[in-house]
Amino acid sequence: MKHFLEISQLSSEQIESLLQRALYFKHTKQYPSYSQSIIANLFYENSTRTRISFELAERHLSMSVVNLDLQTSSETKGEAIEDTIRTLAAMGIQYFVIRHKQDGLQQNLANKLGDTVHIINAGDGTHAHPSQAILDMVTIVEQKKQLDKLKIAILGNIKHSRVANSFQCICSKLGVGELVLISPEIWQPSQVHFGRVTDNLNEGLEGADVIICLRVQRERLLQDDHLDLDFYRNNFALTQKSLSYAKPDAMVMHPGPMNRGVEIDSEVADGKQSCILQQVTNGVYARMAILESLIGS
């Protein structure tokens, strides 16, 4: 692969290869060395999990790592991001992990600069978060092998979620049996890539093998959508009661950060069915697999 931009651009075989390579790294702890490769992390949005996970993945692969401090960079003087990348590429940096609030920015950069650099999308606006989809699927297949037999439910603000967009795509590519998108009507997407939409929490969770909770974006609640937290919690939170509609061994997942007591109760987030910390662990190995697939291409 030249770039890693969105799941829809990958074949099912490429995705399967990334999943298996991530699990190989996790179980063997045998990491190749790519010490001649230099990578820069450019995060124009706040991040804990994704940023640190990518950096750990890079260091496990013995890459030389540059973390750009946007507060002290020429970006504060108005430098365009493409000029920043051209400048860093002239210094010998080949790989760029980028998170940005603008939908499609990484694709545009790849179109303009793709002959000389490799672009990795660490999240663009509400559009895509492909590495999250890979790590989520690594977490699922580690426990539940037959994807075509699974019912997976995504719960929350589907409309504004890059996580939900990328996960729909990966479920379609890998032939997941059933995907249900559970959301209040005001947060339901105008376009569904894969699966079906419902505003009935209990029906959506009925018999689910995997439940993925999405963060309630409080800033959108207050400014745009006029949906109050009490309504959401009473009708869409993942509690012990609502979890009981799923299968007894259902996996509970969340991309983080969590709003405990809003979209998910602590008893569920910390309970025996929770795989949230496994997602965090697997994120490092998934991103190692992604980076390795770009090196030498």
Swiss-Prot record:
Cellular component GO terms held in the UniProt record: cytosol
GO molecular function terms listed in the Swiss-Prot or TrEMBL record: amino acid binding; aspartate carbamoyltransferase activity
InterPro entries linked: Asp/Orn_carbamoyltranf_P-bd, Asp/Orn_carbamoylTrfase, Asp/Orn_carbamoylTrfase_sf, Asp_carbamoyltransf, Asp_carbamoyltransf_Asp/Orn-bd
Binding-site residues, carbamoyl phosphate: R49, T50, R99, H129, Q132, G256, P257
Keywords: Pyrimidine biosynthesis, Transferase
Residues annotated to bind L-aspartate: K77, R162, R215
EC annotation from Swiss-Prot or TrEMBL: 2.1.3.2
Enzyme class: transferase
Pathway: Pyrimidine metabolism; UMP biosynthesis via de novo pathway; (S)-dihydroorotate from bicarbonate: step 2/3
Pfam families named in the record: OTCace, OTCace_N
Subunit structure of this chain's protein: Heterododecamer (2C3:3R2) of six catalytic PyrB chains organized as two trimers (C3), and six regulatory PyrI chains organized as three dimers (R2).
NCBIfam families in the record: asp_carb_tr, PRK00856.1
Primary role: Catalyzes the condensation of carbamoyl phosphate and aspartate to form carbamoyl aspartate and inorganic phosphate, the committed step in the de novo pyrimidine nucleotide biosynthesis pathway.
Name of the protein in question: Aspartate carbamoyltransferase catalytic subunit
Provenance organism: Legionella pneumophila (strain Corby)
Taxonomic classification: Bacteria, Pseudomonadati, Pseudomonadota, Gammaproteobacteria, Legionellales
Name of encoding gene: pyrB
